[in-house]
Amino acid sequence: MGRKKISIAPITDDRSRSVTFVKRKQGLYKKAYELAVLADCEVAVTVIDRKGRLHVFCSSDYQRTLQQLNTLSIYELKNRSHFSSSPVEESSTVSPETTTGSFTPLNNKHLKSQDQPLSDSQLDTGDSPATSETTVQDYNPQVQSYCRPEPLSSNHVRSCPPFPPTQHHHPHTRPPHHPPHPHFHNNNYPPPYCFQSPVSPGATVPLQHHSPYPSDNGFPGHRRQTHFAPYYYPQRATSPSLKQVPTYLGTHVLQQDQSTYDQKVLMPPASYLSSPNQYTLKNVSPGNPACPPFLYEHPNPQLTPEMFDVKQGSPIPPTAYSGSSCETSQHTIANTPFLAYDRSPSLTNQEAESSFQDVASISPHSLSDVKY
């Protein structure tokens, strides 16, 4: 004997009504799940009981399904891409009112008496918000700008190595991150000093000199003398072929461009002004490879290069002096950090001689043979 067919009518008994609600609700959820799996669709079931409690079942995301229910008609959902392998695109915003049950009415008249779908004139057409290629291309320049390396600025300053250690230098004062230079032990070439060219003629910039001699406490160290020397270029206005001085002068620059830069020679000590016959410069002959072509300038126009020659008389009026290699053996090197101590005329002869002796021992121009 089969099951008794229940008449479709409201149930008055509360207990029977609650049992029927639970059983039929689970059966409805089961049918919705089977439909979603078999037909590859999205099914959402919303049930509100007599007491106002909400019961929800959805085969996928419930919020996304409700948003599609508010924005799309029935046959617009058929043309969506969720029937393919790609997932359905979500809308930009989800209204919080979708969970309260404020839904728009659907055009489902064809479900009542028609098996065939509606015609195109009966359907609400609209453009699907598919992702276009132009939207993706708009982000490509921004991504490439982030991945592109930044170029170096024109104000980039090249760093220079410190003054090289000497034989009587303390072993703990040697910088551990600077390997010894191959030209440090060669007396014919100076260490790679760093010279900075001025911005304009006549500018005054500080020059620093590190001397590898014992400091005031008796221990080996660097004694730094800072002085200001004016840069003056008398040949720049008359000689257009003179190249601009680079911001640094290393050993490799000196070896490559020995015929490029002009030379002016070292400044005499202060005691030379009172007794010039005591000093004689030797072993500085033309073409001597021991004198690389440094570029120095004249700080005082009244002091001419002929002051170093003892046999010549009083100073000659100032003119422009230049030379390559060691042609100007009798010239004075001005604007160098080596004779910064002898610029004060208040020094005694003994102090000036001792200072000039220290300078001659470290000069890159082989001034170790200076006699007094």
Curated annotation (Swiss-Prot):
One of its GO terms (cellular component) is chromatin. Residues 81-187 are annotated as: Disordered. Keywords: DNA-binding, Nucleus, Transcription, Transcription regulation. Residues 167-184 have a biased composition (Basic residues). Residues 1-61 form the MADS-box domain. Residues 84-100 have a biased composition (Low complexity). GO terms for biological process: positive regulation of cell adhesion; positive regulation of flocculation; positive regulation of transcription by RNA polymerase II. GO terms for molecular function: DNA-binding transcription factor activity, RNA polymerase II-specific; protein dimerization activity; RNA polymerase II cis-regulatory region sequence-specific DNA binding. It is found in: Nucleus. Gene3D superfamilies: Transcription factor, MADS-box. Residues 114-145 have a biased composition (Polar residues). Acts in transcription regulation. May bind to a MEF2-like typee II promoter sequence. This is MADS-box transcription factor pvg4. It comes from Schizosaccharomyces pombe (strain 972 / ATCC 24843) (Fission yeast). The lineage of its organism: Eukaryota, Fungi, Dikarya, Ascomycota, Taphrinomycotina.
